[in-house]
Amino acid sequence: MLAFLNCEHINKLLDKLDLINHSFDKRINLDKVKKAIFYAKKYHSNQKRDTGEPYYMHPLEVALMVADYSFKTDTIITAILHDTIEDTTLTKEKIAIEFNDNIAEQVLALTRNRGGKKTSSIKMIKTLVNQDKVELLLIKLLDRLDNIKTIFIKPVKRRQEIILETQQEFIPLAEYLKLPEIAIKLNKYCERYAT
């Protein structure tokens, strides 16, 4: 498994979490995080992003950003696994067995495609706000921040839809979470790719 975990994105995340553990006397369980990375890399192994990069790099980047705001092992693992139920053969049941029920429930809560039906981002955000799932809202927000960085590859019509959704749903979410720095970044990407 150690060779499987050897890459720049993985090392960057693990180094950051190790630093958090030492600097803030936190106890992020690095063994569990490594296991989650292994699962993300394994289950996303045949997937590529629109940029051509291996897909697993996206959830690692989301987890890296999440670690700026949350020092909880379950939250970081949820960020790493956030697309697995939706985009791979990994199931909620398998996640519960390998990690715990909380992580499995959180990954499921972030899954938009269920039973052939896709939930809109705004509906998911409203549900998570009503349930006071701040950590999951954070993951959802940072997922959008990482995804919007590559919308230049999308067709113009799809790009415009993503920008509008970001302006109407995710910038207000950043403000709701009291993360003005994220709102500013999202707005800059929207402006950059608007034309």
Give each language-model segment a name:
Residues 1-195:
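Active-site helical microenvironments for divalent-metal-assisted chemistry
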